[in-house]
C-alpha cells in the first residue's frame, strides 16, 4: 500500500524466532531502526533475553549506510549497544541520569500519572524541552512518546509538531482501547500479552477508579519458565491492590494461586474462557473498570464483545 506520495512508512517487525528479523529488515532496509525494550516474549524459541537481543538486533545488518538506531537507554540489554555501524546510537529514557554507562539524548522528567486520562511529562531534547500530554494511560507510554520524539527529530519535525502529534495519538482495538458501555469502563488490551506488557496493563488498572477488575488469560510461547512467569503476574495482581481477578486458561491457574495472597482481591478461576465469561457477566456492574488481556490464541476479544454487547 506504500505509494510514491508517501514520505514515511512506519513498520512493526514482529518476530518470534532467529532469522525472522533478517528476512523482514532485508525487505524494509530501514533508515531508522527503533527497539523499545528486550522483554520476555517468545522465550520458547529465543531462550533468554540475550537471545531476544540477538534476534532483534539482526535489524542492524540491514540499515541504510547512514541509518540511525534509536534505543531505550533504560533497558539493561539495549544499553550495551552504544554504536552501530560506526555511528553512535541515540538513547532515550526516564530521567537524565543512567544506571548504565550511557548518555541519554532524549529523556523525560516530571512524570504525572492521570489514570485513564493519560500521562504528562516534560521531555528534554537537544532541540529544546516541551510538555507532553500523552492521552493513553500507563507509564510505559511515556517511553513510547520518547521513542516517537526521537524518530520525529530525525525526520526533521519541530518540537511543536512532535508535541501536537503525541497529544493527538489514538488507540486501536485490542491496544489499551477504552470502551465506555453500560456505565462501565472496559480497557480492551487483549490483542496480545507477555509478562512485561501484562504488568504494565495491571499498573494501568491500579491507577483507575471504581471496582478494578482484571480479566486475564494465558500468555503463550514462554518456554520452560512459563509457570514461574505466570506466577509472577499473580504476585503483581496481589501487590497492585485491584479488587478482583477473573482468569481462564491452563496456565492462568498460577495467576489465581498467587493473587489469593491478597485477601482483599476476589479471585475467580475457570478452565475455559466461556465459563469465566459467564461468571464475569454476572459479577460486573455500573462503575466498574475492567481490564481484558491475554495472548492472542486465547481469543479474549470475545470477552470484550460479551461485556460490551447491548
Each PLM stretch: what is its role?
Residues 7-18, 186-192:
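Switch II (G3) loop of P-loop NTPases
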Residues 8, 32, 147, 285-294:
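Short SAM/SAH-binding signature in class I
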Residues 34-186, 210, 235-244, 252-266:
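Acidic, Mg2+-coordinating active-site environments of NTP-dependent enzymes
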Residues 172, 190, 194-263, 269:
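Active-site beta-alpha connecting loops in nucleotide-dependent enzymes
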Residues 173-175, 297-303:
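ATP-dependent carboxylate/acyl-activation modules
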Residues 267-276:
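Short acidic-hydrophobic, aromatic-tinged amphipathic segments that line or gate anion-handling sites
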Residues 277-283:
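Short amphipathic alpha-helix with an adjacent loop that forms part of the alpha/beta core around
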